[in-house]
UniProtKB/Swiss-Prot annotation:
Species the sequence originates in: Clostridium kluyveri (strain ATCC 8527 / DSM 555 / NBRC 12016 / NCIMB 10680 / K1)
Catalytic activity: a 1,2-diacyl-sn-glycero-3-phospho-L-serine + H(+) = a 1,2-diacyl-sn-glycero-3-phosphoethanolamine + CO2
Residues the UniProt record annotates as site (Cleavage (non-hydrolytic)): G255, S256
Protein name: Phosphatidylserine decarboxylase proenzyme
Cofactor (UniProt): pyruvate
Cofactor note: Binds 1 pyruvoyl group covalently per subunit.
GO biological process: phosphatidylethanolamine biosynthetic process
InterPro entries linked: PS_Dcarbxylase, PSD-B, PSD_type2_pro
Record key words, sorted: Cell membrane, Decarboxylase, Lipid biosynthesis, Lipid metabolism, Lyase, Membrane, Phospholipid biosynthesis, Phospholipid metabolism, Pyruvate, Zymogen
Function comment: Catalyzes the formation of phosphatidylethanolamine (PtdEtn) from phosphatidylserine (PtdSer).
Pathway listed: Phospholipid metabolism; phosphatidylethanolamine biosynthesis; phosphatidylethanolamine from CDP-diacylglycerol: step 2/2
Signal peptide: none
Length: 296
């Protein structure tokens, strides 16, 4: 059971997990763990499933998925009948007016829809994956000089489950450098997996870039793939100026995670988010929603 805090209702809710029985069997049973290490975490498994999700045969899975998880398709540009395959549906784009982006330059917004956890004054060698598991920023990006810049800074972890909108966005005006790609495995990033496998973010396929923002300093963006994520697609142009809320990229099928690192004394996270994170709960947020302010 995964419990998260709904910021709008001020209530705790139970997450409806896609493939929950499969996840529990895979990550909590001896046979499942053996199969995970032999096949499921491998690129070939996710690649084959990606081929299926890109095929016309996968289209029949779209409507039941929408119905089972009560997805509001009024938020999106394309409607159900227009998708050619499941990956078209999974990487669906929002209508311009379906998310309210706070344009105040002092306001820090969420880069996407998902479940958010935040950590301040981070120890670069003990960043929290989930209670009881930590990892090193150097091992995450394989660049010690870049990692040092975020000592005592702030870390935001936005987990996107398969039912979420899977495009991610820039949180400010600025310029983003080119993307570094790191090969890796394809473990799930669901809390069921995070509680049973150490260093998942450092083991999985991932990409990172430095975003030179106008109001919040240099920000390290890290996109982490997961089981059945066919690819991480970057849609921005390195070196080109972007606006707050512009799309940076998207994930193809699977749950996935966006991690943002801020330098020390650049942002202040809203109190409610810190409180929930300190208690071990994720908070549901939407792209463009205010999650903090500029440090002053």
């Amino acid at each position: 059971m995964i419990k998260y805090f709904n910021r709008k209702t001020k209530q705790y809710e139970i997450e409806q997990v896609a493939g929950e029985k499969y996840l529990k069997w895979t990550y909590c049973s001896p046979i499942g763990m053996k199969l995970l290490e032999l096949i499921i975490k491998k690129k070939i498994f996710s690649k084959l499933y990606g081929y299926f999700c890109n095929s016309r045969y996968s289209k029949k899975n779209i409507y039941p998925f929408i119905k089972n998880f009560n997805i509001n398709m009024d938020d999106y540009i394309e409607q159900t009948d227009n998708f050619k395959c499941f990956n078209d549906f999974f990487s669906r784009a929002l209508k311009n007016n379906s998310r309210s982006i706070d344009r105040d330059e002092k306001v820090l917004i969420s880069p996407g829809d998902g479940r958010l956890q935040v950590y301040e004054n981070i120890d670069l060698n003990k960043i929290v994956q989930i209670k009881g598991f930590t990892y090193s920023l150097y091992n995450l990006i394989n660049d010690i000089e870049i990692a040092k810049r975020f000592y005592k800074g702030t870390c935001l972890i936005l987990r996107l489950c398969p039912t979420d909108y899977h495009r991610f966005h820039f949180i400010d005006y600025g310029i983003c450098d080119f993307t570094h790609k790191i090969k890796g495995n394809y473990y799930s990033v669901n809390p069921i997996a995070l509680r049973n496998i150490s260093n998942i973010f450092c083991r999985n396929k991932r990409e990172w870039s430095i975003f030179h923002s106008k109001n919040f300093g240099d920000i390290l963006y890290v996109e982490v793939g997961a089981t059945c994520v066919g690819s991480i697609v970057q849609t921005y142009f390195p070196g080109k100026h972007v606006s707050k809320g512009d799309e940076k990229g998207y994930f193809k099928f699977g749950g996935s995670t966006i991690i943002l690192f801020f330098e020390q004394n650049k942002i202040r996270i809203h109190k409610d988010l810190l409180e929930q994170s300190n208690m071990g709960y994720e908070t549901k947020v939407l792209m463009g929603e205010s999650i903090g302010i500029k440090y002053q």
